[in-house]
Swiss-Prot record:
Belongs to the canopy family. It holds the Pfam family DUF3456. It comes from Homo sapiens (Human). This is Protein canopy homolog 1.
Amino acid sequence: MNDYKLEEDPVTKERTFKRFAPRKGDKIYQEFKKLYFYSDAYRPLKFACETIIEEYEDEISSLIAQETHYLADKLCSEKSDLCETSANHTEL
């Protein structure tokens, strides 16, 4: 969660979490991991994730029990309506 920060669109005031850190496959990943960032900036993301998990706990358990192939997409789009249906979510 430390790889994300909360940003606010200056025009719409919409708040979203944006990833700023490289992923393991990126060329700069090894250099980036040598750095240490101390920040409470990830706390809103952690709280948002915990809230979603609490709110959709039954749906999450049901999908896991069914061994759904597209668990992230089903949870994000169909069960919670938190995402657009065309999105591909691989990070859950």
